[in-house]
Amino acid sequence: VLLILSDLIKVKGLIMKYRLLYLVLDGMADSINDEVTTLELADKPGLDELARKSICGLMYTVGKGIAPESDEAVISILGYDPHEVYTGRGPIEALGAGLNIREGYEVAFRANFATINPVTRKIIDRRVGRNLSTSEARELARALDNMEISIHQGYAKVVATIGHRAVVVIGSRTRKLSPMVSNNDPAYQRKGLVSIAVENPKPYVEPITPLDNSEESKAAAEIANAFFEKAVEILDKHPVNIKRVENKLLPANALLLRDAGGSIPKATPLGVKYNCRFSLLAEMPVEIGIGRAFGAEVIPLEPPTGDPRVDYEKRLNTTLKALEKHDVVYVHLKGPDEPGHDGKPELKKQKIEEIDKYYVQPLLSYLDKYAIIVTADHATPPSKKTHTDDPVPILFYMPGLLPDNIEKFTEKNCMRGSLGILEHGWLLLPTIIEKYLKN
């Protein structure tokens, strides 16, 4: 996460000297128990130079023992306790995709187009080999959108977002529904409204079940399961999938559902919380939805072109323009997370190096103007192929600040920094503001 602070920002009556750029490198961290981490292997002179001029530390982005999903982690590092405000990932993704939820009668899920054996329900690939194009996904979603479901006068709305990702909203015209239902995606286990990443999950679709004894939860589970079955029938015969199979590609013949929610989070907006003009730059629906839900001015980033130089130069230019108009600019860069999930350490290393070369290094020429924090929303070690509960590194730079003399920006080096170890991500901004930025 990269934080840039500028002239005379008032936060809770305090005066901050600098505008704030808050840059999150999604899934950048690995496990502190790994023999060697991606940050240790990466050639990243920009981040290392920042580290040498900064104070450093580690942070559990939600809490010890919690391997967070991205949404609850981002909510936390923005300064909110997700246990108090979180309503499930589904509504946040829906908001990011432009869908509104009819509270009480609709439940939103984050969904993955996936490949399954339609007879045994064995999951072959949770993400369709990561090669489902957004245009293919949108065509498949159109075949499912506005589906009528016979039970409880139900219906479903389906929107494809980016790649294999989608949002599914189920509803009933006659029954109230509750989001207290399980996931059918075995990679994430529901605990209340929060999902926890599961190491080595069983590769089978699980029926969605109510998490309490209410009729509303039972009805929601029944509609969701009926939607899943009908979706498999439609998708398995869809021309997009027939063509994919002919081309020796995996078919996107199922939707894995997780993280149900029935309402948008209600919390003090970011601009009010920090008494500043707060903007958020992101490309993924989940971060866009968080920005909208928590009152930031959202600046959507263009989808990646595949050319990292072009992509990160555009993102940096957008960042600098946003800093001309806003006191705090949160920037979320996705790069390192996917190769972590896919168990590809060399590709994760490459993604970090690309961000360093084309985004961070050019940013160094602005060190006289800004203070900077760099961190991650969670760890995604290639050794585990999932989010883990490991703490993530933080660096904080501000002109005139006495540095910790950390030579390289890595998990183990940051452990020795003067920021110490923050037990919760929601402590980061208040700590920095109170301890270092107040005049």
Task: Write out the residue ranges for each language-model feature.
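Feature captures the catalytic ectodomains and active-site-proximal regions of enzymes
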Residues: I4-N439
